[in-house]
């Protein structure tokens, strides 16, 4: 590959699961991939596996990243400046569930429409929910804002936000929040913050149900709804970027006790397709199974 044609990617939360699968696919496509993970030991093990099992030594390197830590993000930015001088692709994958899954089979049955008590599936707490918003939304925002200057140096800057159908507007039961997130012409990051602050306040007070917020996978749903809103804002702000949200589907990962119906390789197909977009691709969209669906 000619040096001037080389493309550079960052994937967050990539030591396993979907993030790891995206790294493997991008590196196999000739992209130089910076695999990041909060846990350095696990991240280095992932890199060694990619090198030994898939012969990708020339296309993968590791850097530690905690998306919740501004200092960690700043260190990553400095590293990319020194090593690459620019960035072409950012895949925001790092995420947590906002709860503790206790029974994968019960989760599967609930997803399939059975009347299952949520307590049988697992439990959610305010502290776990707060952490979920911090990582899944504010972590993405922090990393993205820090890397935009390097993405601007690319001829085809691309951001892929790994989201979920859970965050679609039809699943946001609070009418005010749904209205705010739907009003793309007037949507701002400050308005997203206002919604999340109201949500956190009601969560802390134990009034999610009476205030009309989601009560199952509550913080996860709200974090992904906020992420989708952020995708749309950023796509408007940077019209020469490709910025999209994508639901990889119900993929077998640790997050769902491997109850998903898709393999990692199947789940990463659409995220990788979006990551490799060149000049004429879509932006400001929500993708799943290779197709655009309404937010």
Model-inferred region functions:
Residues 96-133, 152-236, 247:
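Catalytic loop of short-chain dehydrogenase/reductase
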């Amino acid at each position: 590959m000619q040096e001037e044609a080389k493309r550079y990617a960052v994937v967050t939360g990539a030591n396993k699961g979907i993030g790891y699968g995206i790294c493997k696919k991008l590196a196999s496509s000739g992209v130089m991939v910076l695999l990041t993970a909060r846990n350095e030991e696990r991240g280095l093990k992932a890199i060694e596996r990619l090198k030994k099992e898939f012969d990708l030594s020339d296309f993968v390197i590791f850097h530690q990243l905690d998306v919740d830590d501004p200092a960690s993000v700043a260190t990553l930015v400095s590293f990319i400046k020194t090593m690459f001088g620019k960035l072409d692709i950012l895949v925001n994958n790092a995420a947590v569930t906002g709860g503790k899954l206790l029974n994968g089979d019960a989760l599967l049955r609930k997803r399939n429409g059975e009347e299952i008590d949520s307590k049988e599936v697992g439990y959610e707490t305010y502290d776990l929910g707060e952490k979920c918003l911090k990582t899944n939304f504010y972590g993405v925002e922090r990393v993205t804002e820090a890397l935009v200057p390097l993405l601007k140096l690319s001829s085809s800057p691309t951001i892929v936000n790994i989201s979920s159908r859970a965050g679609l507007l039809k699943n946001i039961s609070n009418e005010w929040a749904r209205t705010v997130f739907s009003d793309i012409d007037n949507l701002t990051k400050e308005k997203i913050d206002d919604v999340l602050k109201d949500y956190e306040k009601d969560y802390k007070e134990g009034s999610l149900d009476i205030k009309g917020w989601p009560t199952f996978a509550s913080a996860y749903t709200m974090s992904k709804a906020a992420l989708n809103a952020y995708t749309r804002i950023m796509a408007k702000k940077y019209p020469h970027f490709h910025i999209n949200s994508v639901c990889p589907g119900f993929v077998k990962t640790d997050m769902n006790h491997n109850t998903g119906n898709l393999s990692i390789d199947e789940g990463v197909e659409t995220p990788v397709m979006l990551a490799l977009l060149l000049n004429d691709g879509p932006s400001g969209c929500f993708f799943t199974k290779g197709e655009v669906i309404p937010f």
